[in-house]
Amino acid sequence: MSSLPVAAVLPELLTALDCAPQVLLSAPTGAGKSTWLPLQLLAHPGINGKIILLEPRRLAARNVAQRLAELLNEKPGDTVGYRMRAQNCVGPNTRLEVVTEGVLTRMIQRDPELSGVGLVILDEFHERSLQADLALALLLDVQQGLRDDLKLLIMSATLDNDRLQQMLPEAPVVISEGRSFPVERRYLPLPAHQRFDEAVAVATAEMLRQESGSLLLFLPGVGEIQRVQEQLASRIGSDVLLCPLYGALSLNDQRKAILPAPQGMRKVVLATNIAETSLTIEGIRLVVDCAQERVARFDPRTGLTRLITQRVSQASMTQRAGRAGRLEPGICLHLIAKEQAERAAAQSEPEILQSDLSGLLMELLQWGCSDPAQMSWLDQPPAVNLLAAKRLLKMLGALDGERLSAQGQKMAALGNDPRLAAMLVSAKSDDEAATAAKIAAILEEPPRMGNSDLGVVFSRNQPAWQQRSQQLLKRLNVCGGEADSSLIAPLLAGAFADRIARRRGQDGRYQLANGMGAMLDADDALSRHEWLIAPLLLQGSASPDARILLALPVYIDELVRRCPQLVQQSDTVEWDDAQGTLKAWRRLQIGQLTVKVQPLAKPSEDELHQAMLNGIRDKGLSVLNWTAEAEQLRLRLLCAGKWLPEYDWPAVDDESLLATLETWLLPHMAGVHSLRGLKSLDIYQALRGLLDWGMQQRLDSELPAHYTVPTGSRIAIRYHEDNPPALAVRMQEMFGEATNPTIAQGRVPLVLELLSPAQRPLQITRDLGAFWKGAYREVQKEMKGRYPKHVWPDDPANTAPTRRTKKYS
């Protein structure tokens, strides 16, 4: 084993660990960094305490632990053990624990000092999983505040050294070049006329015919693996084994894919991107890369995760090709045009930028951090995703202001997805706890295909679900209890209230309580049910509606009876313009879904008035009797707020008036029981009621409704929201006025629209004095000819004004 490439850098690595709290190790897959190096570190006297090795994938974690134990001629659970969701294999003598990401986070939360741990290794860090980024942030916080003696080793096949070194400038970087042989990289775009699975199978079978050795085939997901395997079966010889490789397989099937083919046989390993770097698959000389991967992208607008199939990055293509050169010169066939491959993104996007962050936010709040920016991140969590996470935690009752509520603390202590944690802590009896635990186990590991009825799935007893249920019940300190299908609906409703769904039409389409659409196959037996709770949804790329993967049919009346907190009651009004009456209704709703509508028989005046106010808010202020006088009063108040801000003017914009209807309109509604009566309300007086006597006097003085011109005429001022106030007056009535009139304590000049004797505009000005001295001469000249019997003096500023339209003889 000492011939492994990473052995060459072991002395340098041990020295670095002795001298620095954080060390970066870059070593390609197959160098021995996961399956040999941890045992050497275990023997190093400079590391005091246990070693925790984080593997981001469960499949890799179990296989790494198995391999390390075999090297010691032991079984997992002795010196080397592992911990993952629903599976623990550690003993009293375990000194090296291989754990998955969520497990490491739980260990840190329960014991922030990581007592008894000397070294934490983050393996495959280049994958930049959400939990790995969180683990790094927490570990750096632990080192800084609690354990300056804790060592941290960050290992990767393609380490992003520049960014990590910026974040950890004092950390030594150890590089193992690895051992690889030349790989010939070929490119072949798939024919457009052929189905994907068939085209991939044809290309793979052709490579097997032309070349010797076992082959690793990269595919986007399990569905493609199964379909391509079926296509390949009829295209290969009896000396070729087909070995799928993905997380849901049994340990024996996974080992069959990882170990060398039997003597005289070849194998084709059909794998997802887990085989890029997480596992060393022995005996591979050929690689076929479909150049695609399936990734999850969270949509903060809908709260749903969308699975998309996309082209892999150039870094992933390089990693995939490298798997062909571990033992001897190899060949990699990329099923993509070379120019397309060269245009691919350089690196894959980190999960933290495209994931649901509700679990991360709950972990940070449990850690005592209400501002994620206070932690150390390679990429800051997106603000919009954090906002969506906060909304969900609030809906689940996990927040008290900016901190975790008592319920939120119980949820965080469980370490589950926030929705499942909320469901688990809501259990009030042992039977409810047992039911919630089984539901959580099913939703964590849902069946890949088959029945979409959660009630039917719940009736099954799969060993993995039973094992996980028992683990969750232990965390809840519950012994006993029987899982009861009659308890599923109320438990689900508390955690998935926004995913209660009502059928719309007969084609399997539903509307969710959050307003989103969802769908079942039209022939799915569930589609005959009016109401569902759909805890498992997947947002596809082809349809705006989410696909319902698992749902429970419910009787809505029974659900409302058992969970009254789900329902919001609202009294609304319908306007019957033809009859001039109001019809009041009471609606029971769950989110945006209407459960029941019933008329309000003989509502009291208070109920009717409230319904009318709700109706005004629904339809807008335009339903009220806005006379010209009322509209001008409102505009005067709006302008007063801008021009005289030192006084406490009431807010009269639409939003404010609608929000305060009870304050200014309701007191004037006594005896109003109909739409006709509502339209007869004096809105002018209602608005003036917003002002006390002193403010009314100030408004009338500083922003008057009328202006008295030199002739004594009281002429209405026209106020505008976005334009200066205007006064339309015949020019002769302004003679003798030397300066432009102003309002608002002289701060705002009136716009004068000076009219001809025929009431046609002659001039618009905000500086009357300048007009008399300047442009008036041109007006005078023209008007004398057009209106010779009217007064057009040479000195209008000092001429007596007149209402008369003719000269005296």
What does each model-identified segment do?
Residues 686-748:
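C-terminal accessory/binding modules appended to enzymatic or scaffolding proteins
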Residues 181, 518, 714-716:
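Short, isolated positions in well-ordered beta-strands
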Residues 111-126, 136, 290-294, 303, ...:
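Extended active-site and interfacial segments that coordinate phosphate-rich ligands
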Residues 121-122, 250, 254, 426-447, ...:
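Charge-dense polyanion-binding interfaces
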Residues 399, 432-517, 530-706, 745-809:
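Acidic, serine/threonine- and proline-rich low-complexity intrinsically disordered segments
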Residues 1-423, 483, 538, 722-724:
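P-loop NTPase motor module signature
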Residues 520-521, 585, 717-718:
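Short capping micro-motif at the N-terminus of alpha-helices
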